[in-house]
From Swiss-Prot:
Its main location: membrane. The lineage of its organism: Eukaryota, Metazoa, Chordata, Craniata, Vertebrata. It comes from Mus musculus (Mouse). Phosphorylation by MAPK1 results in changes in channel gating that destabilize the closed states and reduce the ATP sensitivity. Residues 117-133 dip into the membrane without crossing it. Inward rectifier potassium channel that forms the pore of ATP-sensitive potassium channels (KATP), regulating potassium permeability as a function of cytoplasmic ATP and ADP concentrations in many different cells. Inward rectifier potassium channels are characterized by a greater tendency to allow potassium to flow into the cell rather than out of it. Their voltage dependence is regulated by the concentration of extracellular potassium; as external potassium is raised, the voltage range of the channel opening shifts to more positive voltages. The keyword Nucleotide-binding applies. A motif (Selectivity filter) lies at residues 130-135. Residues 93-116, 134-142 are extracellular. This is ATP-sensitive inward rectifier potassium channel 11. The modification Phosphothreonine is found at T341.
Length: 390
């Protein structure tokens, strides 16, 4: 029997599975458009860009950013066009030298065995991909042919370097590593050390670590300045805590990242009722680090809308000790349980700490009352009758 530590108390009941597939996908009320999707994609469409030529100043990045069908099309067409272009050059050299005229075999040709455009095209492929010459080869008769041979080899090497490098960068892009960095589907707000905290869980499915991992969080909401200026996407950085202080994390096992809602937090006036009808609140979480195996910087992103924040719940433990090592149960990665939490804003809690004292007293009496009621209702396993004593 495996020894386990950190078993969930029996009085707690699992209330929500964060990855519950049965949750309805469509809602009756209209939701605010996300700035960042749950998978980390930025929901921004760029329109009316006048200076399109700026993209051509960085051709390599433009090719890497293209979709795979477009990249493969450019990859194929670049080689085909270069072969056809130099095939035309070889055909013109043979035509100018008179190598295409039938019945004249006394002159030494510039390139042997070129009698048509098809043979010139085959010779162009043989030169550029260096698969070796067959019956066609360059002679010493035409210095121009030797120069074209050198130019085509250099151009072929440049095309290989650019296109193969582009394909390699697309297959080794950093966002591929981010597919195994996961966030909890829901965030929670509950008490920790007597303060309301915004919490989420983050984990890494791979054994290879993320070096120098840091996590940041921003609140994006629509605001209006005192001068009447409407800012549709006002971004505010808020500090995150991971139990040891600072933004750096050691992501060897899933961690609960939390933000203390204090007077400097944009969530200071957030109430439980605001989570059901708040349309302008979006919390963006960014995890960034260096991939241990490749050394490439990767970034994983997600966001939480107001209705994706659970008030008065916390994440269940998923790390247990088994046979001298720690085991992580990812099936409970998004599970939460209800815990006593004041139904007020952090500002109201700071102004009236008696709410916290009353909550602490009620929670301490709760388990005792449950046990006393259970003992009172329990039936004895056996009874002793007076006749048996006589």
């Amino acid at each position: 029997m495996l020894s386990r530590k950190g078993i969930i108390p029996e009085e707690y009941v699992l209330t929500r599975l964060a990855e519950d597939p049965a949750e309805p996908r469509y809602r009756t009320r209209e939701r605010r458009a996300r700035f960042v999707s749950k998978k980390g994609n930025c929901n921004v469409a760029h329109k009316n860009i006048r200076e399109q030529g700026r993209f051509l100043q960085d051709v390599f990045t433009t090719l890497v950013d293209l979709k795979w069908p477009h990249t493969l099309l450019i990859f194929t067409m670049s080689f085909l066009c270069s072969w056809l272009l130099f095939a035309m050059v070889w055909w013109l050299i043979a035509f100018a030298h008179g190598d295409l005229a039938p019945g004249e075999g006394t002159n030494v040709p510039c390139v042997t065995s070129i009698h048509s455009f098809s043979s010139a095209f085959l010779f162009s492929i043989e030169v550029q991909v260096t698969i070796g010459f067959g019956g066609r080869m360059v002679t010493e008769e035409c210095p121009l042919a030797i120069l074209i041979l050198i130019v085509q080899n250099i151009v072929g090497l440049m095309i290989n370097a650019i296109m193969l490098g582009c394909i390699f960068m697309k297959t080794a892009q950093a966002h591929r590593r981010a597919e195994t960095l996961i966030f909890s589907k829901h965030a929670v707000i509950t008490l920790r050390h007597g303060r309301l905290c915004f919490m989420l869980r983050v984990g890494d499915l791979r054994k290879s670590m993320i070096i120098s991992a840091t996590i940041h969080m921003q609140v994006v909401r629509k605001t209006t300045s005192p001068e009447g200026e409407v800012v549709p996407l006002h971004q505010v950085d808020i500090p995150m805590e991971n139990g040891v202080g600072g933004n750096g994390i050691f992501l060897v096992a899933p961690l609960i990242i939390y933000h203390v809602i204090d007077s400097n937090s944009p969530l200071y006036d957030l109430a439980p009722s605001d989570l059901h009808h708040h349309q302008d609140l979006e919390i963006i979480v960014i995890l960034e680090g260096v991939v241990e195996t490749t050394g490439i910087t990767t970034q994983a992103r997600t966001s939480y809308l107001a209705d994706e924040i659970l008030w008065g719940q916390r994440f269940v433990p998923i790390v247990a000790e088994e046979d001298g090592r720690y085991s992580v149960d990812y099936s409970k990665f998004g599970n939460t349980i209800k815990v006593p939490t004041p139904l007020c804003t952090a500002r109201q809690l700071d102004e009236d700490r008696s709410l916290l004292d009353a909550l602490t007293l009620a929670s301490s009496r709760g388990p005792l009352r449950k046990r006393s009621v259970a003992v009172a209702k329990a039936k004895p396993k056996f009874s002793i009758s007076p006749d048996s004593l006589s």
